[in-house]
C-alpha cells in the first residue's frame, strides 16, 4: 500500500502519569475507532501500535509494549494513521455523510460547467468549506486559481462519490466570479 492509502487519525501528545499513557489528540470525527486491540500505523515507518487501553474521558491511550513512562515518551508528537480500507470498516457514516478522503479530488460542477476540483476541506466551526482548485479554463479567463464553497445545502445540491462529482447550485459560480 502507498501513502495515499492511509489517513491521519490522531496525534500523540505528552505522557500522562507513570504507566505509559499518552494524550491522544483525535484528528478524525470518529473517536469510536480508538478502542482496545485497535491498531494504527506510525507515519513514515512500518511500525504498528496496538491499543491496550483507551480512556475516552480524558483522551489518554496506552499502547502495548509502551507500558512505562520512559518508553511512552518515544511516542510524543507522533502521527497515527489508519488504512482507508480499515477506516471504512470501523467508522460508520450516517446518511449523507462522507469521508474527507472521498470528497478530496472530486470534480465540482454547476449544471454543465466544471468549476474545478476539491483540494482541501476546512472546518469553520459550524460548517465546512470545500477548497476548490479552479478549472484551467476559468484561470485562463483570469478567475482565481482557488475559491471556497461552503458545504451547505444552499450551495451543494448533490455529492456522487461513485462518479467523484459534486453538483452545486447556481450560487457556486457566483462565488468563483466574486473571489
Curated annotation (Swiss-Prot):
Descriptive protein name: Ribosome maturation factor RimM
Name of the coding gene: rimM
Disulfide bond sites: none
A Gene Ontology term for the protein's cellular component: ribosome
Primary role: An accessory protein needed during the final step in the assembly of 30S ribosomal subunit, possibly for assembly of the head region. Essential for efficient processing of 16S rRNA. May be needed both before and after RbfA during the maturation of 16S rRNA. It has affinity for free ribosomal 30S subunits but not for 70S ribosomes.
GO terms, molecular function: ribosome binding
Subunit structure: Binds ribosomal protein uS19.
Domain notes: The PRC barrel domain binds ribosomal protein uS19.
Domain annotation PRC barrel: ranges: 95-174
InterPro entries associated with the record: PRC-brl_dom, PRC_barrel-like_sf, RimM, RimM_N, RimM_N_sf, Transl_B-barrel_sf
Species annotation: Campylobacter jejuni subsp. jejuni serotype O:2 (strain ATCC 700819 / NCTC 11168)
Family that this chain belongs to: Belongs to the RimM family.
GO BP annotation list: ribosomal small subunit biogenesis; rRNA processing
Record's keyword terms, sorted: Chaperone, Cytoplasm, Ribosome biogenesis, rRNA processing
Localisation: Cytoplasm
